[in-house]
């Protein structure tokens, strides 16, 4: 079973959210990076761009496929992980740490409440793979 930290919130699109005040740090789950295989390129938005919840904000290209990235919450991008320019494989090595994607100043912090808990996400991925 993939690593699913308890302190994060999860989307059914396999993104995670870590809340830091009014900021959401967003990345893809261990399950997602495992399904993708070796990541070779990550396309992220620019700081200052705004997104609605569940809107595509970029893509991840792996040796297997290209997958869109979706923001589970709405808001303005305040940071992007510049490390992906030279090291896209950080997504595979540390999806919940150095492999974070973007930081968003949340418009509606309550949106996080509609996301899955770690246990719910584990159940979702099990059901999805059956």
Language model segments and positions:
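Aromatic- and Lys/Arg-enriched surface recognition patch
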Residues: 78-102
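Short, Lys/Arg- and Gly-enriched loop/turn segments at beta-strand edges
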Residues: 59-70, 87-89
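A short beta-strand motif that forms part of the nucleic acid-binding face
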Residues: 30, 64, 73
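Acidic, low-complexity mobile loops and tails
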Residues: 1-56, 93-130
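Conserved hydrophobic positions within beta-strands
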Residues: 14, 60, 69, 74-78
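Residue-level recognition of beta-strand microenvironments
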Residues: 17-19, 63, 80-83, 109
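Gly/Ser/Thr-rich helix-start
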Residues: 38, 59, 66, 76, ...
């Amino acid at each position: 079973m993939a690593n699913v930290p308890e302190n994060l919130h999860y989307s059914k699109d396999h993104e995670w959210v870590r809340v830091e005040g009014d900021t959401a740090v967003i990345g893809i789950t261990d399950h997602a990076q495992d399904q993708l295989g070796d990541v070779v390129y990550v396309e992220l938005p620019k700081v200052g761009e705004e997104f609605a919840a569940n809107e595509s904000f970029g893509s991840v290209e792996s040796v297997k496929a290209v997958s869109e990235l979706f923001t589970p919450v709405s808001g303005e991008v305040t940071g992007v992980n510049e490390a992906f320019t030279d090291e896209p494989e950080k997504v595979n090595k540390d999806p919940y740490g150095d492999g974070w994607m973007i930081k968003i100043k949340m418009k509606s912090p309550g949106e996080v409440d509609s996301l899955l808990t770690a246990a719910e996400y584990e159940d979702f991925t099990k059901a999805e793979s059956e």
